[in-house]
Structure formats: structure tokens, C-alpha cells
């Protein structure tokens, strides 16, 4: 009996972890002119309201988490500065 209860609780915990996974939303723009690239953030801690710092073609921007994968979070270890990016 105890092993059945444990199995159910384990399954519930695993499904909760999977369902609570959050992602960056799919970017709206698929391309960007180099002169328009701007980083509003370089890591999640630069964002407010538990938003994610997401990499997009026109720079890094804070977005509310999405339940569906499609975007890409900024690597917090990557070299990054906020503001306009000049090439």
C-alpha cells in the first residue's frame, strides 16, 4: 500500500515540475537591421516582475514567461552590455 501511495505522489510531483516549466516566448521579429540592435537586459535579474531576459534578433528584452517553448533565454555567462550594440 505504501509503495502505491509513494508512486502516485512521485508521479504528481514529476508532472507538476514538467507543467510548471516556463520559457521565453517566440520572438515576434525574425530579422533586424544591425543599427537597431539594443539590449534591455543581460540576465534575468535585470528584469522586473519575474520576467525572463530573452534573446531576440534585435537584442535582449524582458518578457513574461510562456508555457510554450519557442524563444531563447540569454546566457547569463555571455559577454553582454545593456544599451545599443554597435558593430
From Swiss-Prot:
It is found in: Secreted. Residues 21-66 form the WAP domain. Its main location: secreted. Disulfide bonds join 24-54, 32-58, 41-53, 42-80, 47-62. GO terms for cellular component: extracellular region. Has antibacterial activity. This is U14-lycotoxin-Ls1b. It comes from Lycosa singoriensis. The lineage of its organism: Eukaryota, Metazoa, Ecdysozoa, Arthropoda, Chelicerata.
Amino acid at each position: 500500500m505504501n509503495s502505491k501511495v509513494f508512486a502516485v505522489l512521485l508521479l504528481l510531483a514529476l508532472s507538476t515540475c514538467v507543467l510548471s516549466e516556463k520559457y521565453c516566448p517566440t520572438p515576434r521579429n525574425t530579422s533586424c537591421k544591425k543599427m537597431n540592435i539594443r539590449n534591455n537586459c543581460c540576465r534575468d535579474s535585470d528584469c522586473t516582475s519575474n520576467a525572463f531576459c530573452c534573446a531576440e534578433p534585435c537584442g535582449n528584452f524582458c518578457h513574461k514567461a510562456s508555457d510554450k517553448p519557442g524563444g531563447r533565454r540569454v546566457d547569463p555567462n555571455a559577454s553582454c552590455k545593456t544599451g545599443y550594440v554597435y558593430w
